[in-house]
Amino acid sequence: MSANSFGKLFTVTTFGESHGPAIGCVVDGCPPGLELAPEEFTHDLQRRASGKSRHTSARREADEIEILSGVYEGRTTGTPIGLLIRNTDQRSKDYSNIAQQFRPGHADYTYWQKYGIRDPRGGGRSSARETTMRVAAGVIAKKWLKQRYGVLVRGFLSQLGQIRPAGFDWDAVEDNPFFWPHAAQVPELETYMDALRKSGDSVGARVDVVAGGVPAGWGEPIYGKLDAELAAALMSINAVKGVEIGDGFASAAQKGTEHRDLITPEGFLSNHAGGILGGISTGQAVTASMVLKPTSSLRLPGATVDADGSVVDVITTGRHDPCVGIRATPIAEAMMALVLMDQALRHRAQCGDVGEVSPRIPGQVDV
């Protein structure tokens, strides 16, 4: 297996390259009867799309979805759902000067070592263009989770370089190109990114994603833990170098009396665990965050070697994101939704006859 598929009961297989004729995916395991139309994909695909602000890549793709199979008269049939998006704004000539060079910090060298051949145009299969189809598949998962269980998956940018939110408002997240939760800071982010872009450098970021309404009981110990699969899903996103569940690495500095989430009949008093204990959901919000490294495609020269082993300086032209984290929020949401839908179906398959178990503790209460 070449690991282009994700999930067990609800599976997603993606295909295509950044500068190929098209990208696509096959979604299998979706229950029948879910209403699904091409226009339902537009919102999330446009949230992920480049060319929407001066702070992202200038590449402009229409990202119009084509449903090839698995939907009849507007409803899923239970058979594989084929989705396709045609690439229309490739500029492969921008990569001719680095076709034989390995960009430091990029997958050029590792793909070459693994396969002995690589597609240098836009990064080929290693390009974040592939995540477009993850977002498309996530649209299906988000809708099913919301309709079936009332689960709402949403995310936001929680750090850009050294800048962190000075406040939080979910309503602000969708009103700016950064998915930033504090509207008053958006001008600061604009100024920072303008200066960064002019310098030719890039910067890292952090994205938080939250799923509210997840019932207690989802997750499979020992090797199918909800948090383990969520961490793997987020780590599979391009440029991600770290993932936290709940308080994550901050837990190392906490005492047990600080970290444990006390329980009352009215609900949990905190959520340091991120809504998961023993690999199984608690009924609280499932929370995770991921850190993305700075973009490695830079206009600033950097030392490397070429395919002949000669020392060269590489300069990347073309259209690239100075901060990949700016467009990563919809991708993180999609991956969490895919994990949750797969886990929901697996839980239903094994434990659907268990029924309501008492006591059922509500989610976190305000204290």
UniProtKB/Swiss-Prot annotation:
A GO term, aspect molecular function: FMN binding
Annotated EC: 4.2.3.5
GO CC, one annotated term: cytosol
Broad EC category: lyase
One Pfam entry name: Chorismate_synt
Domain of life of the organism encoding this protein: Bacteria
Known catalytic reactions: 5-O-(1-carboxyvinyl)-3-phosphoshikimate = chorismate + phosphate
Pathway note: Metabolic intermediate biosynthesis; chorismate biosynthesis; chorismate from D-erythrose 4-phosphate and phosphoenolpyruvate: step 7/7
Region (Disordered): 41-60
GO biological process terms held by the UniProt record: amino acid biosynthetic process; aromatic amino acid family biosynthetic process; chorismate biosynthetic process
Similarity section: Belongs to the chorismate synthase family.
Role summary: This reaction introduces a second double bond into the aromatic ring system.
Binding partners and assembly: Homotetramer.
Protein name: Chorismate synthase
